[in-house]
Structure formats: structure tokens, C-alpha cells
Amino acid sequence: MVANPGGGSTDAGGGPVRHIPVLLDEVLSALAPAPGKLILDGTFGAGGYSSAILAAGAEVIALDRDPTAIASGQAMVAAHGGRLKLVHSQFSHLADHAPQGGLDGVVLDIGVSSMQIDEAERGFSFQKNGPLDMRMSAAGVSAADVVNRAKVADLIRIFHFLGEESQAPRIAHAIEKRREEKPFETTRDLAGLIELVTPRKMKDKIHPATRVFQALRIFVNDELGELAQALFAAEAALKPGGRLVVVTFHSLEDRIVKKFFSDRAGKASGSRHLPVAHERAATFAAIGKPMVSASEAEAEINPRARSAKLRAGLRTEAAAEAADMSLFGFPNLASLGKLGG
């Protein structure tokens, strides 16, 4: 499944975008903000969730790894008289900015923000020509670095696993051939090549470059690793009765959140080899339905909501468990950081 990261386009790479928080009513229902409560918004973005949480009377610690979002949010900080603390940080580091076991709620809205899609110079959209960057902050390798330097086998892994792209080998080999002549510099450079290699068919609902752009963005920003670390950090930071609410936009993210809550439900998992499994105390209990999606009415108003899924859990009295990345079963794509040396 490929998400539309914002606005009035069904293409995952761009289109006109509205700054509308997705599943806002459902998020507030699951999060239950109220006066006297301290909520951490791990993905401040344009401030949609934080604004609604503040309106309910709670105090907010809001994080964002994008310095542009932090700068844009200063007016909101000034308007709320100390009830909003805005921090430049990745949400995987939320434990550094919140009292351990002291939060009443954590909300995470995963993926690229509508503001980032709007800015062509950030390189997130194949519909807006700009530098092939895709970094949510200025640190680390860019999408151009990956496309121009990664081994073909590594490009195939990235496109196949993170983009669920069935044409990954064909696209990767075409990239290798083209970059020998001229390096990729812009989003249109890459999107144009993909269009030539895998032309759009009449039945296709998404642009041919959608899955590759998604894969590169996720890889460059280590989005799956960030999400997994944030879930573990939230488990330790929430007080008993605290609420963890996560909104995702594609199947890889949702799979991680689903697996986390399933594991933290504490149910023993024996097998024919080890029929008696150790019973574990649940660290989270379910809040409402296992998964909530947007109504047709919301999806019509905000197309980004069409692929959104919300999962939520209520923190129990049990001690937080150790972080274990092997729980999620995805390959260590971070090992590709050398990009072919």
C-alpha cells in the first residue's frame, strides 16, 4: 500500500496539499486530553494536533526534526503562555524531553508532512521539480547520494522492501546506466527516468515513481527505525493510564505499530518446539477498535486521510520491556549507509 502524503492529489509524491490534521476527532477521542494532563506530540508539523490538544486544556511538549517546522511554530508557542514547549528533535528521542513515566499521552503522525511536500526545494515530490534531497533535516545522506552511489543490489533492496516496488530490478539497473553518463540531481531527473522504464498504464492509480520516491524518503530518514524506537520510548515515558496514539499512512508503518501493540498485549506465544511459553504482563491494553480508518466524508475533504490508520493503546501498571528491534523483522537497511564505498 502506498500513501498519499497530503492534500488534493492521489499521487504519493505531491499535488496541492492542505494543512489538515488527519483523523483529528478520532485522535482526540483516543488521547483524551484534558486540563492537568501532559501530552507529547512527536510530530508537530503544522501544529494541527498540538493546537487541538491545547484547546482541550492540556499542556503539550511538541517535537519535530524539521527546523522549518520549529521556526513556523514559534507564534503558537508565544500564544499559549508556557503551555506549549516546542523542541527540535527526532521523535525517537522523546525520552530526552519528557519525564520518564510522567506523560499522560503520546501522539505520533508518521511520515512526510504537508509542509515538506509543498516546498519543491526539499525534494520530496516528483510533481514539483527540485533538488533530489528528501531529508527531513539537513543531516545525513540525501536521496541523490543514494541514487548516485548505492550498489544496484542495494537499490533493489531499498525499492523492493521500503517501496514494495515490483519493478525494482528494472528501475535500479536503469539508474545505474543513466548515472554513468550523468548523475541525478533533481526530482524530475529521477521521475523522468522511471516514467521511461515503467510507463504508466491506464489502469494504474498512482504515478510510476510513487513507490521509488516513498522508498528513498523512508530510507534517507530511517523512518521505520525511528518509528520503532519511538514506540519503545513512549512505553517508558507514559504513566499508568497514559495513552499512545499512532497514525500511519502505509502498510510498512502500520505493520510495525500493529506488531508492537500485539507484542505488548503480553500474550504468551508458544510453539510446537517450545509449547510452554513464558507468560508476560501486558504493558498496553487496547483502546476501542484495534484499528480506525477515516470516514468517506473525511477522505473526500482531505484525500491524505484515505490511507490513514489509527492504532492506540492504554499503558498498564506493568514495567516497560526492553527495546528489541528484532521484534519487527525488517532487514538492517542502515547497513547500506556506505553506499557502495
Swiss-Prot record:
Any Pfam family the entry gives: Methyltransf_5
Enzymatic reactions: cytidine(1402) in 16S rRNA + S-adenosyl-L-methionine = N(4)-methylcytidine(1402) in 16S rRNA + S-adenosyl-L-homocysteine + H(+)
InterPro entries (UniProt xref): RsmH, SAM-dep_MeTrfase_MraW_recog, SAM-dependent_MTases_sf
Disulphide-bridged cysteine pairs: none
Gene3D superfamilies for this protein: Putative methyltransferase TM0872, insert domain, Vaccinia Virus protein VP39
HAMAP family per record: 16SrRNA_methyltr_H (MF_01007)
PANTHER family: 12S RRNA N4-METHYLCYTIDINE METHYLTRANSFERASE (PTHR11265:SF0), S-ADENOSYL-METHYLTRANSFERASE MRAW (PTHR11265)
Protein name: Ribosomal RNA small subunit methyltransferase H
Organism of provenance: Rhizobium leguminosarum bv. trifolii (strain WSM2304)
